[in-house]
């Protein structure tokens, strides 16, 4: 659908400008997940110039990842307050400025603050809003859209690392950081295309009779009262403890098994190539009519497959067995990447997705800071990769079993409650109150159109031929909250 005038009651376009938004989301996802790993190609030069150890230089990527995950609630607040496009533009500038300033660093601390904190924060302010906009533009094709967007991670990871190696050899790490900073300005271009979907102008929440209009929280913690959301949170925590460990240790594990360096490094390329194919394919599969209502179980199946792959391959020693492990791991890893945010969108709905995503990323940040570092310490202490693979696989299997069993129990418990109309086949626990409130008539609002009460908006009543007399500022129209009426269909 084109960007025509507002249409009353229109849902997500599922196409049109949404494909441009999907392309931008593909780029942002690639930068967010690929950039912290791509920076690691400069670590050898950083160690030489600063006289530091590997663990000291590795903190640059660690801080960047911690900012990407840990600032989720901050991103949610900013998106709810200002909208997706302004936050993404600011994030692109921050990410670029961080790398440019890092190219002039004379101490490791300066690298931590610039490339780590500033660039990590900038990537976080791009990643979360891009996923939110994707949910606003796609409903029927949303699983496919999520799979295609998630494919940006392996594509950029396999591209940025060789590019960084080339830039480092030709211009040094300072020149490489400077050019990477210019490359990150593409995040601003991606943010610029994030225009709101066509639809009615936003209207603020009404004031209760005889009182002031209700102030809605910028970070909606009420989503934590939803049982299915809490199940998802626990699943993501358990998953993040072990999901990334095999990929991190794979090359060293292969070398320990006697595989030559070049062939060991190629194993990661195999994982990346399979991952690129698996993500969009899994997204298309999850979008099929008969499978889409069961996406949480597909996610559980992907986790089980990934964990069992780790357990079965823990004793792999030959190169052929390791190649088979990489193919199976890349396939299951791609399935997890394609389904993780689709499950969250289906669980909480578009109106609560910004707050829910911020909380999930914060929980995942804690797990990421526990799992891989602990695995590294165990390897140093035990000199045994087999135990680490068993431990990581067990954690991921536990996450898959927990997701499947608790989802089934939640569905059984809610069978006696008649589901409300929803694109996903029902409403979550916390959406019923909102649906009941939204069905009431809209009285005149006493608040300014740009206030926080405009975060969740309603479509104009069918019997109202003319729009409100007050002009609504563009800032509110940009806000994700300004599209709740459309996002609820997601």
Curated annotation (Swiss-Prot):
Among the Pfam families in the record, one is: MFS_1
Q: Which intervals of the chain are annotated as region Disordered?
A: 419-490
Q: Which InterPro entries match?
A: MCT (IPR004743), MFS (IPR011701), MFS_dom (IPR020846), MFS_trans_sf (IPR036259), Proton-linked_MCT (IPR050327)
Q: Which organism is it from?
A: Rattus norvegicus
Cellular-component GO terms for this entry: apical plasma membrane; basal plasma membrane; basolateral plasma membrane; plasma membrane
Domains: what does the record tell us? The two basolateral sorting signal (BSS) are required to direct SLC16A8 to the basolateral membrane.
Keywords for this protein: Cell membrane, Membrane, Symport, Transmembrane, Transmembrane helix, Transport
Its protein name is Monocarboxylate transporter 3
Main role?
A: Probable retinal pigment epithelium (RPE)-specific proton-coupled L-lactate transporter. May facilitate transport of lactate and H(+) out of the retina and could therefore play a role in pH and ion homeostasis of the outer retina.
Cysteine-cysteine disulfides = none
Q: Which family does it belong to?
A: Belongs to the major facilitator superfamily. Monocarboxylate porter (TC 2.A.1.13) family.
Cytoplasmic topological domain? 1-14, 80-85, 137-147, 194-230, 279-293, 340-352, 408-490
Mainly resides where? membrane
Q: Which gene encodes it?
A: Slc16a8
Q: Which residues cross the membrane?
A: 15-35, 59-79, 86-106, 116-136, 148-168, 173-193, 231-251, 258-278, 294-314, 319-339, 353-373, 387-407
Single annotated GO MF: lactate transmembrane transporter activity
Which residues face the membrane's Extracellular side?
36-58, 107-115, 169-172, 252-257, 315-318, 374-386
How does the entry describe its membrane topology? Multi-pass membrane protein
The catalytic activity, as recorded, is: (S)-lactate(in) + H(+)(in) = (S)-lactate(out) + H(+)(out)
């Amino acid at each position: 659908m084109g960007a025509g005038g507002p249409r009353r009651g229109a849902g997500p376009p599922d196409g049109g400008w949404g494909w441009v938004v999907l392309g931008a989301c593909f780029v942002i996802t690639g930068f967010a997940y690929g950039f912290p790993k791509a920076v690691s190609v400069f670590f050898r030069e950083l160690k030489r110039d600063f006289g530091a150890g590997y663990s000291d230089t590795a903190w640059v990527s660690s801080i960047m990842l911690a900012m990407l995950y840990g600032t989720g609630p901050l991103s949610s607040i900013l998106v709810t307050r200002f909208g997706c496009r302004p936050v993404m533009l600011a994030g692109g500038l921050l990410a670029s400025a961080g790398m440019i300033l890092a190219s002039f660093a004379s101490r490791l601390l300066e690298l931590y603050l610039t490339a780590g904190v500033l660039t990590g924060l900038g990537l976080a302010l791009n990643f979360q809003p891009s996923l939110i906009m994707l949910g606003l533009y796609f409903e029927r094709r949303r699983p496919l859209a999520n799979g295609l967007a998630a494919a940006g991670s392996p594509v950029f990871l396999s591209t940025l690392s060789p590019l960084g190696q080339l830039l480092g050899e030709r211009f040094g790490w300072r020149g490489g950081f400077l050019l990477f900073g210019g490359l990150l300005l593409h995040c601003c271009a991606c943010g610029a295309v994030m225009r709101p979907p066509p639809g009615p102008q936003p209207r603020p929440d009404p004031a209760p009779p005889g009182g002031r209009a209700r102030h809605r929280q910028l970070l909606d913690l009420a989503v934590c009262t939803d049982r299915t959301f809490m199940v998802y949170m626990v699943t993501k925590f358990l998953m993040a403890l072990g999901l990334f460990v095999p990929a991190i240790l794979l090359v060293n594990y292969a070398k320990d098994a006697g595989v030559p360096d070049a062939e060991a490094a190629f194993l990661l390329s195999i994982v990346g190539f399979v991952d690129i194919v698996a993500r969009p394919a899994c997204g298309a599969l999850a979008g099929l009519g008969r499978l889409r209502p069961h996406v949480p179980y597909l996610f559980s199946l992907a986790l089980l497959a990934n964990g069992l792959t780790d357990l079965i391959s823990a004793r792999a020693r030959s190169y052929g067995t390791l190649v088979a492990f990489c193919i199976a791991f890349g396939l299951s890893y791609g399935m997890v990447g394609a389904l993780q945010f689709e499950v969250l969108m289906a669980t909480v709905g578009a109106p609560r997705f910004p707050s829910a995503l911020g909380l999930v990323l914060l929980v995942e940040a804690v797990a990421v800071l526990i799992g891989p570092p602990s695995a590294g310490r165990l390897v140093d202490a035990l000199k045994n990769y087999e135990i680490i693979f068993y431990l990581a696989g067990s954690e991921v299997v536990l996450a898959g079993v927990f997701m499947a069993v608790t989802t089934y129990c939640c569905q059984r418990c809610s069978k006696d409650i008649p589901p409300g109309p929803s694109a996903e086949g029902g409403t979550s626990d916390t959406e019923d109150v909102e649906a009941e409130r939204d069905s009431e008539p809209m009285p005149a609002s006493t608040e300014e159109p740009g206030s926080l009460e405009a975060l969740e908006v309603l479509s104009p009543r069918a019997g109202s031929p003319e729009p409100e007399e007050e002009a609504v500022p563009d800032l509110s129209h940009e806000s994700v909250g300004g599209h709740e009426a459309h996002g609820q269909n997601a």
